[in-house]
């Protein structure tokens, strides 16, 4: 079904607004994926804050023109699904995890911070922990010296308490 000019402009505007808010774009070929599998992928993506879209490549190229994702315009050929995410690693994680279990989804590439990513770049990005996990790890690192100091002081107080005679 072809779109008329106003519908195409609406699609371009919607994708342009997605691209403006997103940090990451992942592009994957979905040839041969069943509707049920595609639905699972979309549900998983939605739960992680990733917007997945199947777009005409010419409309996608126009939508990302002039944005940080313009660097992947040459990769936009064939039946592709586009994953935009505001979280730096969410789109890469969702698509890479799904591609591990479904060999019909083939990662083509993507873009992050104005740089084009190849397949390995997307997979490396997917291996980075999420922002929340990194913050939790940082808090753990910051709390570790404090808790160690408290344990040492507690042991020192217990040791000093053992050496003194009990009050009568």
Curated annotation (Swiss-Prot):
Record keywords, A-Z: Ribonucleoprotein, Ribosomal protein, RNA-binding, rRNA-binding
Name the source organism: Acidovorax ebreus (strain TPSY) (Diaphorobacter sp. (strain TPSY))
| Family under the similarity heading | Belongs to the universal ribosomal protein uL10 family.
The UniProt entry, under PROSITE patterns, shows: RIBOSOMAL_L10
- Role, per record: Forms part of the ribosomal stalk, playing a central role in the interaction of the ribosome with GTP-bound translation factors.
Which HAMAP family does the UniProt entry name for this protein? Ribosomal_uL10 (MF_00362)
Q: Mind telling me which PANTHER family this protein's record contains?
A: 39S RIBOSOMAL PROTEIN L10, MITOCHONDRIAL
Q: Name one GO cellular component term.
A: large ribosomal subunit
What's this protein's name? Large ribosomal subunit protein uL10
What GO terms describe the biological role, i.e. biological process, of this protein?
A: translation
Q: Which gene encodes it?
A: rplJ
Domain of life (superkingdom): Bacteria
**GO molecular function: any one?**
large ribosomal subunit rRNA binding
Record-linked Pfam families? Ribosomal_L10
Q: Which InterPro entries match?
A: Ribosomal_uL10, Ribosomal_uL10-like_sf, Ribosomal_uL10_bac, Ribosomal_uL10_bac_type, Ribosomal_uL10_CS_bac
Assembly and interactions? Part of the ribosomal stalk of the 50S ribosomal subunit. The N-terminus interacts with L11 and the large rRNA to form the base of the stalk. The C-terminus forms an elongated spine to which L12 dimers bind in a sequential fashion forming a multimeric L10(L12)X complex.
